[in-house]
Amino acid sequence: GGISVPGPMGPSGPRGLPGPPGAPGPQGFQGPPGEPGEPGASGPMGPRGPPGPPGKNGDDGEAGKPGRPGERGPPGPQGARGLPGTAGLPGMKGHRGFSGLDGAKGDAGPAGPKGRPGASGPAGARGNDGATGAAGPPGPTGPAGPPGFPGAVGAKGEAGPQGARGSEGPQGVRGEPGPPGPAGAAGPAGNPGADGQPGAKGANGAPGIAGAPGFPGARGPSGPQGPSGPPGPKGNSGEPGAPGNKGDTGAKGEPGPTGIQGPPGPAGEEGKRGARGEPGPTGLPGPPGERGGPGSRGFPGADGVAGPKERGSPGPAGPKGSPGEAGRPGEAGLPGAKGLTGSPGSPGPDGKTGPPGPAGQDGRPGPPGPPGARGQAGVMGFPGPKGAAGEPGKAGERGVPGPPGAVGPAGKDGEAGAQGPPGPAGPAGERGEQGPAGPGFQGLPGPAGPPGGEQGVPGDLGAPGPSGARGERGFPGERGVQGPPGPAGPRGSNGAPGSQGAPGLQGMPGERGAAGLPGPKGDRGDAGPKGADGAPGKDGVRGLTGPIGPPGPAGAPGDKGESGPSGPAGPTGARGAPGDRGEPGPPGPAGFAGPPGADGQPGAKGEPGDAGAKGDAGPPGPAGPTGPPGPIGNVGAPGPKGARGSAGPPGATGFPGAAGRVGPPGPSGNAGPPGPPGPVGKEGGETGPAGRPGEVGPPGGSPGADGPAGAPGTPGPQGISGQRGVVGLPGQRGERGFPGLPGPSGEPGKQGPSGSSGERGPPGPMGPPGLAGPPGESGREGAPGAEGSPGRDGSPGPKGDRGETGPGPPGAPGAPGAPGPVGPAGKNGDRGETGPAGPAGPAGPAGARGPAGPQGPRRGFSGLQGPAGPPGSPGEQGPSGASGPAGPRGPPGSAGSPGKDGLNGLPGPIGPPGPRTGDAGPVGPPGPPGPPGPPGPP
């Protein structure tokens, strides 16, 4: 065999026609959860939701334990001076005083002349008794002297010392506390406390797994309302907020009436002996003593010598007489001056805590306080799982295409994200049937006709037409006149309840307002989500039972009683007329991307669209196998950039190449700028046969929440103050009664107002793709969604022509050749080496901003994921067209078969703590009268 020398490269053949679209690739694996994104900025505060249903009254708390004795209060003010006491009883007889000392002996007088003894004189009178003194010891007996002259009356003796004061009696024991006095009047209500500190902000939870975004499906007609699902699990309780500041102390209440005096206490122990009292006043003189009897006659004396008549000295003192009898007790003296106030005694031991008194009556509500300040906006909660797609609605009329808008600025190429590992393959959904195409232009809405007949069986599915050759890009048409808005579609079925949002920060608790008159009963709204259970209240202290007053004026309706058992479902009400279209709401937060939908039927071939904007640069593919080394040529000088040649004739179909290795899925690029509006599509097909009527749906959902509260009424007149009644014994708590019988079914209610957004349910079944409507105006720019999972690998495109080496002259535009026969689909060729990135094109001029489009729906409907088309050649960066007017809604597509239930989303993070006290609920109807209480004690 000879050596094969490579010959020169032949000319490039004509470019082949694009092959038919390849079969849909296998379901892509779901990637692992991405890195948690940066927390978004807090969005604007949404409108205040309707008031929730009033909570049930909690059961009475257990009686609180008796409190500890309070601290000793400051000493009270000095009491008023007491009245003079009654005259005391006469004192006890004093003890006998001690014997007085003997008196001093007097000086002897001068001796008198001795007289002759005269006749015996009469006996002298007996002197007065001296002061009563104790008998002294007898003195020595002197010699008997001659009888002296009668002595003079002795001077009055001094009063003896007063007896010592008796010891004070023991202090009495502290008496038992008397019964509690009546409760004093309630003091005025204290000022409201200051605002509490806002609770700590809850941590942002990690976003859920991002699914691949589906294409929006057409909205179908509203189906019957499904039964309400079971209530969801109870959410975790929020963390308690920081404690609030202590409120100002209320004004001091008026003192209560004086309590009844308690019984006297038992006798106390004997006290210590008191100090000696001061001497009392001098007593009155006693009565004169009895006169003594005559003395014995003396002996005659001897005759004395007459001397000078001098007075003789007195004789020696005679013996002291015996003490006289004790005198009568003196009269009671005047009451002495009031002594100084004694210091307060030490506090006695605390008495035992008495049993708790009966509960007091509730006080009258105070005047309404000023409205509380609005709390801070709560942290925006994470978007809940994607809701189920609604059934397709009726399509509106097709508008006339508008003129092209101004050229917008060219978008920058986004950076390629990190490549994630492939996830497990998800289950493929069931494929729905494709209905026939709808009619052409829709007329103005006519009057509502009678209910139609039975729905016909859907027609057979037509075979898809052959794929036509791709036409050249046409010039954008002129912007047509905006068509009239289409008729409002029927109200869609109620979505599944959405996930509970994060509770807002704690607001200032408002004061309790005055009870208003009941407002008119509002229409019955949809049932709102069940609120979180409130924190258990603190055990209150049971107060004293107040007096029973006369019946006052009719009060405001009481709180709503506990809900009884659900009655039997009533008949389905007549469907109300569709309500007026509401104002467009603010754009909602971007929801999580849903899971990839099931592969749908291939749709009908659409009109050739304009070339899209240049996509982002794809990730570099894996290196292909190294080819044989070619001959080394001379390096030529770079030639000038040639003009873009026109498309050449299609070349012959080449042999299918060898199957290449499937590379790993590349990361999703950033979304490019919107392309110009496409041309108006063809009119739809003929109207399909009417379908058969559906089965009767399940009974409607649970009754909605009460309507809004009525306007506050004027306060009623002040009731007459009642007399104080006898304190009754607290009655025993009655047992809970049996639930009442269910009431009769009511008439169908009026169409209620739109309910608040429910919790977002699991993704519903995917409907078939509807007809493509004209492009609408650009809505507001939404928040960037989560990064989608890697898309499926598209079918490989036809092998491109091999370019000539070296710079060639610009070729003349050739005539378009006839389309060649469609060759068989080629096998995947080896992936070529990644070429260098081209230079970035110049940025286009900034286009004028188009008119603001109408507010889009809060949530788009997840469409079916179509089969991946062959990759087209990258087009040049086209100018961004202006947003076209919103086209009318197209005719409704046929209902698709129900899809499989989606997977439940991950639980959201625990939100920040909610307010401790919620807004006051609407005033409920008056409850039934309670049973009479037990009679009080007589």
UniProtKB/Swiss-Prot annotation:
It comes from the Eukaryota. GO terms for biological process: extracellular matrix organization. Keywords: Extinct organism protein, Extracellular matrix, Glycoprotein, Hydroxylation, Phosphoprotein, Secreted. One of its GO terms (molecular function) is extracellular matrix structural constituent conferring tensile strength. InterPro entries: Collagen, Collagen_superfamily. One of its GO terms (cellular component) is extracellular matrix. Residues 137-149, 619-631, 762-772, 807-822, 923-938 have a biased composition (Pro residues). These protein fragments were extracted from an ancient pelvis bone collected in Newburgh, New York, USA and estimated to be around 11255 years old. This is Collagen alpha-1(I) chain. It comes from Megalonyx jeffersonii (Jefferson's ground sloth).
